[in-house]
Design a protein with these regions (language model features):
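Catalytic cores and adjacent flexible loops of soluble metabolic enzymes
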Residues: 1-304
Length: 304
């Protein structure tokens, strides 16, 4: 693995991490969390989602959060589940949105209340409208490694969905292990297949840690040339529509490892650990991450 390797890390804790948390954080606490993460050096933070509050009440204050962060809006990404979500994001001044579609109809119906085909059709329209307004669009394919409703997912199926996204003009696609069932060999095989099928796409990875394999899966993806990852401060997260799934790969745990390997990330890990500890106090609950629990209490250097 090249020592000159650089990794781009998208911090999704404020959205993916908080969307299924049992208690809703006050808006000022969310704003403070996003600002604190940006201060760590993240170039992109997924701040919220334009989902209907009926489905995810924890993110009902999306516009208020974005209004409070207008001076840093160019560093924020927002999940938009549909065209109405894009309209809301545009009105809020957002310059980068994320769209998602499942590799299976079973999960897509639970998550977005429509079929994969219908979602892909809407994403094409979203991408066209976003390009018209100079808004960048990133995409993810959820349950790419296994589905809680439809079971095993064939690589060919993932490729078909990803190809439809690429045909719609989307250049950055992340494959998500939404329920945390992937293993390193599967990760390597799927990313190699996708890179051969769609070499012009920039591929990213989004892992959950249900079986404790997220870090190993990250390294496997890294070996295939993937250098774009998503994770969550403290390891919080999980989809309301993926029963039993654990949180996202823990950002500070993974980034500390990458730093120790000499891989550049641009993120101040010591500062991120402090943010994780502050979030743990705010949530008044232990977080799944590990490194933030280590001494010294006030991080000066990150233990190897």
């Amino acid at each position: 693995m090249s020592q000159d390797l650089k990794v781009d890390w998208v911090e999704v804790g404020p959205r993916d991490g908080l969307q299924s948390w049992p208690r809703t954080l006050p808006t000022p606490a969310k704003v403070g969390l996003v600002a604190g993460l940006l201060d760590c050096g993240f170039r992109r933070v997924e701040a919220t989602s334009m989902v209907h509050p009926k489905w995810v009440p924890q993110l009902a204050d999306a516009e208020a959060v974005l209004e409070a962060l207008q001076d840093r809006i160019d560093q924020l990404r927002v999940l938009v589940p549909n065209r109405r979500g894009l309209d809301r994001a545009r009105d809020a001044g957002v310059r980068n949105v994320a769209v998602t579609v499942a590799a299976t109809d079973g999960y897509n119906e639970h998550n977005l209340n429509r079929s994969v085909r219908e979602t892909l059709e809407e994403i094409q329209v979203i991408a066209q409208e976003a390009r018209r307004d100079n808004i960048a669009v990133d995409a993810s394919v959820s349950v790419a490694f296994g589905c809680p409703y439809d079971g095993a997912v064939a690589p060919e199926r993932v490729g078909e969905v990803a190809s439809a996204l690429a045909d719609g003009g989307i250049e950055e696609i992340s494959l998500a292990d939404t329920i945390g069932v992937a293993n390193p060999a599967q990760v390597e095989a799927l990313f190699q297949a996708m890179k051969e099928r769609l070499p012009a796409v920039r591929w990213g990875a989004h892992f959950h840690d249900t079986r404790g394999t997220a870090i190993a899966n990250l390294l496997s993806a890294l070996e295939t040339g993937v250098n774009l990852f998503e994770g969550s401060v403290g390891g919080i997260g999980g989809s309301p529509f993926a029963p039993g799934a654990a949180g996202n790969i823990c950002s500070e745990d993974a980034l500390a490892m990458l730093d120790a390997m000499g891989i550049a990330t641009g993120v101040d890990v010591a500062r991120l650990i402090a943010v994780a500890r502050g979030l743990e106090r705010t949530l008044d609950a232990p977080l799944p991450g590990r490194i933030h629990t280590l001494a010294p209490a006030e991080i000066g250097t990150v233990p190897a």
